[in-house]
From Swiss-Prot:
Family to which this protein belongs: Belongs to the WD repeat HIR1 family.
Subcellular location: Nucleus
WD repeat coordinates: 127-159, 182-213, 232-263, 279-310, 323-354, 380-411
Source organism (scientific name): Schizosaccharomyces pombe (strain 972 / ATCC 24843)
Keyword Nucleus on entry: yes
Biological process, per Gene Ontology: chromatin remodeling; regulation of DNA-templated transcription; transcription initiation-coupled chromatin remodeling
GO molecular function (one): histone binding
Protein's name according to its UniProt entry: RbAp48-related WD40 repeat-containing protein prw1
Keywords: Chromatin regulator, Nucleus, Repeat, Transcription, Transcription regulation, WD repeat
InterPro entries noted in UniProt: G-protein_beta_WD-40_rep (IPR020472), Histone-bd_RBBP4-like_N (IPR022052), WD40/YVTN_repeat-like_dom_sf (IPR015943), WD40_repeat_CS (IPR019775), WD40_repeat_dom_sf (IPR036322), WD40_rpt (IPR001680), WD_repeat_RBAP46/RBAP48/MSI1 (IPR050459)
Keyword Repeat appears in the UniProt entry: yes
Main function: Has a role in chromatin assembly and chromosome segregation. Involved in the deacetylation of histones.
Name of the coding gene: prw1
Amino acid sequence: MAVSAVPHPSKQAQASEEGINQEKCINEEYKIWKKNSPFLYDLIITRALEWPCMSLQWYPEQQIFAEHGYTEQKMFLGVRADVGKYLLAVASIQLPYLNQTVPPTTMEGASAGDESSLRVNISNLYSHPESVCSAKLMPQDDSCVATVGNYHNDVLVFDKESFESYSSASESPLKPKYRLTKHTQPCTSVCWNFLSKGTLVSGSQDATLSCWDLNAYNESDSASVLKVHISSHEKQVSDVRFHYKHQDLLASVSYDQYLHVHDIRRPDASTKPARSVHAHSGPIHSVAFNPHNDFILATCSTDKTIALWDLRNLNQRLHTLEGHEDIVTKISFSPHEEPILASTSADRRTLVWDLSRIGEDQPAEEAQDGPPELLFMHGGHTSCTIDMDWCPNYNWTMATAAEDNILQIWTPSRSIWGNEQLEEDATAYLS
């Protein structure tokens, strides 16, 4: 019998029909979500970008225009403009001024409803020399950004001079201040140190991590910035994160299903993690430390779950969050509320979890909608969510970007999260 890579015609027809049915289902779900969104959100902004957004991050500062009833926030984006063409962009986003009495606002495209003049504008575009899968602003100096991409092995660092000297009239891309070279395969993630200015870590498909110190840069010796090169994983490193309160601690996760915690002060740091745990039954995609708690971190995986861990005892998982129907791609703790965690997935959903509700009694009819700790489900995207970020200046406000070029900024309704008990129970999940 001949073996063919081409599906049988009947199978092709079946697959085509299934695809059409799935698209219809997605469209129906979106219509239901859009109809109900005024009751679910205090704010929802939808902006169709010209290109897919591969990476997004809010700037920490804001400008307040109280007399006009809005503030202007900025967001840094990494986008794929075309085949072989990549851009970095700055978006200016107007959000309702918090001291104003602003009704729930739904915005489609670049403008809001009848009363609002709020806008989302792309204010700056910069040609990037390589692909961009992650772009991160330095916490101590947001004019400095580090980027990594799917098709090149280096970490590129751009400073204020890089952006100021850029000419949009020229066909030349941005010139990096530093090109950090060590990895032998494309990088997947990058993270700045929150306490040590100029220190960053990168993870790569070559199964290694590199920790860099830009303060040690020597023009005659480019390798001088490499602080430590870590070879502890067996497969692709998918995410890396520095601890918020300990500058020498960082975590890495990999397709080898392991979570590693590294102390870069150790003499054997280059080959052996300080802590290691087989964390999931499938490749791990993201890791996140809790910025409010020294010991809590989370991981997420292809196995559709999110795992909670305590650094003091990684031998035992604290809890498993189950609610996604596909690969969980990214997780992030709220910068404002200790027990709040958000997760994105290939199932097109962004879930918001309240860890203080773990173990609460739940009526049977509510259990059908998910566990008690599942606080909110954002269903505004019709394709896989690529990236997300909490707004640093607005509590409970997030930005999410999907494969279909849609950028959304949203705040769940206060009726959902405005629970006085939340603050009292902020650390209940640790007990």
